[in-house]
Amino acid sequence: MSDDTTQIEPAMAQETSPRANTRKVFVKTYGCQMNVYDSQRMADSLAAEGYVATDTPDDADLVLLNTCHIREKASEKLYSALGRLRKMRDARAADGKELTIGVAGCVAQAEGQEILRRAPNVDLVIGPQTYHRLPNALARVRGGEKVVETDYAIEDKFEHLPAPRREETRKRGVSAFLTVQEGCDKFCTFCVVPYTRGSEVSRSVKQIVAEAERLADSGVRELTLLGQNVNAWHGEGEDGREWGLGELLFRLARIPGIARLRYTTSHPRDMDDSLIAAHRDLRQLMPYLHLPVQSGSDRILKAMNRRHKADEYLRLIERIRNVRPDMALSGDFIVGFPGETDQDFEDTMQLVRDVNYAQAYSFKYSPRPGTPGADLDDHVEEAVKDERLQRLQALLSAQQYAFQDSMIGRKMDVLLEKPGREAGQMVGRSPWLLPVIIDDNKDRVGDIIHVKIVSTGTNSLIAQKLA
């Protein structure tokens, strides 16, 4: 799951006729797709309390920062934002107005009370497993408390979250995220997820199907199933048997209106036979797979506690491509992990050449407090990390552009997602996740049209509609 992008995600769709004194909320989302989903669900719970969204903090009564803790500077980003909000809050106070400030997400979970110590202007700190308690926490804030809600909940948060209103969901678009699994039990030595998101938990089939049906009823055509380790999902199926992610995908594909399915992020250890069979047999499952490996060196993979070897990963890729020859792969890589030698890095470069990725994310290793990796010796010099990252990214970029160029002349179905920048343009999504720009005046958002790719743009494809 990509995790280094800061974005502002509107918390919810604006009600058509908000009440004059309705409270407004602004949510800023940092990081991964699951944080985007969490922001939307927090907004759904606030909508039930009478909040409406605003796309700027300037007129918000409540500002929530939904944070990511994967990368080294996550906390610094948070405190910089809180400093700006403190000035805004002081200006409001001078005019006799109030501003409530909340911190949510994985930095909230990791730092808890420390956030209140460093930023006394914060009113609320709430973790990713407790945001279903947000309305109650805000009521306590209005009563004068400083609230920290980061204890892992005994109750199932998804049972306590209100269903999103149909019109709000419709305004979010024809593609939607749906969290089916949270947490991770793998304990990779570089990763904070087990400490901020907790142990692996799978939502029930009943919950997932009900939410997917609501999304489809609101016009969603494409679902992306989310989880920190999404292919570890398991649960009792409607037939009484234990299901894995493959069986769940087959069930969701039966929902009327759902034309496309994706999932992210996966661990190589949990790619089982039923999931590979789904890639072979399920036409709604798109031929794009994000399957992080992190390194091509067995020695470094062992130090990372990845629980697989490089050749096992390559054999898995071969199995997947044998059943789905048009499968495009993306991945994650860390360079400069403690003890990484020149040969270890060259092993990574060779694995990248062997796989030939359509896209990949790559980062320099940065020690995360509280992880085993932070206690390792033999750290790689920053200059060496920089040089290795530059070389790796050059190779990955060349592969990405080659993949895009390979699309020229191909015919494919494209899901139209939004109007383009130019009059008459539409922007859609290819099966391989690339944006596709089409000059089209007749079709609507949500339609799936057949096109031919005629050229490429920067990280996009240019297409002509076929009759």
Swiss-Prot record:
It is an enzyme of class 2 (transferase). SMART domains: Elp3. This is tRNA-2-methylthio-N(6)-dimethylallyladenosine synthase. Belongs to the methylthiotransferase family. MiaB subfamily. Residues 405-467 form the TRAM domain. Residues 1-20 are annotated as: Disordered. Binds 2 [4Fe-4S] clusters. One cluster is coordinated with 3 cysteines and an exchangeable S-adenosyl-L-methionine. Residues 170-402 form the Radical SAM core domain. Monomer. It is found in: Cytoplasm.
